[in-house]
Amino acid sequence: MQNIITMQVLSATSEKGFSLDELVFRTKELFEKEGLASFVGLILELVDERICLKMVQGKIQDGSHACCLSPEYAHHDLTDRQFRTSVGKVIIRWRRLKCTGCGKTVIPLRQFLDLELYQSKSSELEKLVTEVVSEQSYRRSSSHMELIGSIPVAKSTAHRWVAQSDCDKLDSSDETLDLLFADGTGYKRRPDDDRDINNRGELRVALGVDKSGSIAPLGAFSGKSWKEIACAVNGRTDTDEPVADMLISDGERGLEQNLSVLCGDHQRCHWHLVRDLNYTMWQDTAGKLERKETQKELAAIIGIEIPEEDFEQVCDDDKDALEDAVAGAERDIRKLIGKLLDKGYQTAAEYLIRASKNMFGYARRWLKTGIVTPRVSSMIERMMRELARRLKRMAFGWSEDGAAKMARIIIKRFTSAGQWEKYWRERLRIQNNVMLVLRNIKAENPQTLGQ
């Protein structure tokens, strides 16, 4: 269906001069308030007229919604409808046809556009609102959209749209991941005295890295234990294979105990390892200077670097030297644990004993497979900083479900943009079925105005 649409705009400018800003402002005002929405509405009415005419003439049949064996349609009435979109409020009068045989009525344009029964907004507006509120609070988002984009959406309406959307759903795969990261951060949730729930909420996130190096978000959870999270992560696959080859964590006990069994190996984050030793020695009443010296000693022991060359180019002697360095580092760790025990630092010693089991998984994996594994959990830490920057500022008093949903939206947008855009391409049905071409913009001779 092709149509040539003519748009007439009357422009009147002062001969004494005007500012460029006023011209741009008035142009934007005209098209945002009237032009664009009216343009969309006109195209819809033209399509509606064409479809209904062909159905009444019997040239096309409503096969997917046929009411009887040989339906014949006649015009029944017109219904006013309006849709909220990013270009403004689109107002149309669509036709309702009635079958002369059985009396059933249909709205061809609604079926043609595949709209829901009581749909009052476009999906592209929902996408815009969701992306804006993932950056700032609902109140600020509402003001921002009206001020910058002239899109009035109340904060309660935006909240309802996001809560009802399934855009936070994450893709699943049976492929074994290369790496698994997990971490948590606190936020002030909505308290509930009846259920004995305080305002100290915790948001926990699991991320994976696949064999190609792409980040795969696995989920965001609030009010869930690490055991429940492990069950959810493990349930994403239907196979008995490990979820990931290597877990990289900060050593939190619940996380380590429940997620390490889902992976082939476990690597403790070296940065957290050194930092947390200071805290455990403080619990043992060690002095500040001694704590700092012990931290430096631990950092020197575990600072074993992987050769920069490709695995195939590293000679056997260098590989043997790396293996000997790991064995020597493990002996030094045992000596350090003995020193801590001799000084009565029981908490710090137990901390290193537990951590020593997974200190050098990255080196052993490289020696076995040639795959380089990070020694720190900086990737998940960066993601948690982004989440904390948003949620701790705007999620005050949120429910646990609301905070988890927004976290899934954020990690999907920022760690797997491909998933996010794929979802919305399918949802918006962008399939090159509409083409608009601006042929020309020209002015009429002023002498013909008013004729």
What are these regions (language model features)?
Residues 2-45, 49, 60-61, 67, ...:
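Acidic/histidine-rich catalytic cores and adjacent linkers
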Residues 129-135, 374-375, 379:
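Short basic-aromatic helix/loop recognition motifs at nucleic-acid
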